[in-house]
Amino acid sequence: MIELTQEELKQHFSEPIFGQIAETADTLGMECYVVGGYVRDIFLQRPSKDIDVVVVGSGIAMAEALGKRLGRGAHVSVFKNFGTAQVKYRGTEVEFVGARKESYQRDSRKPIVEDGTLEDDQNRRDFTINALAVCLNKARFGELVDPFGGMEDMKEKTIRTPLDPDITFSDDPLRMMRCIRFATQLGFYIDDDTFESLCRNKERI
């Protein structure tokens, strides 16, 4: 894992598409963050093509506005049922979603979704290393938001859930499979509380 200053982190967002996203977000008055695996993989020095952007507001409105700004070379796909949209532009794909809160009923894997804040969105992430976010708005461009100690967990090579693991796994039992996959792929250790919860809840997969 590498450690980066904010100025060094900004260099990883120097491609023109990020500047266009930032300008679109500022024009719309929306907070906008790159989240999840793309941010994680910068610090782990792993290649990553999946760019996921969380908008505090409508991800679909953001994607449509970006598509108009980019012009004829952009292709926008809207998935209204999921509240998400994708913009393809010159070989780059960016997924947009509005920040949201999710809750699950015990007998269902279908989430109850409400609009939320960035913090709400990070709360619902599976693991701390995937809850990292980097702001794209001009005033805070390149600022890392790490509320759960994901950077420290990467340093310690640890897989840990942002919330009580029983809640995280109960919300979506398939996260237990992802936990094992990440630990295997990255050579990380599963935090004791997380592992014990995984053992307790394994029948739910």
Q: Where are the predicted features?
A:
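Catalytic cores of the polymerase beta-like nucleotidyltransferase superfamily
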Residues: M1-I205
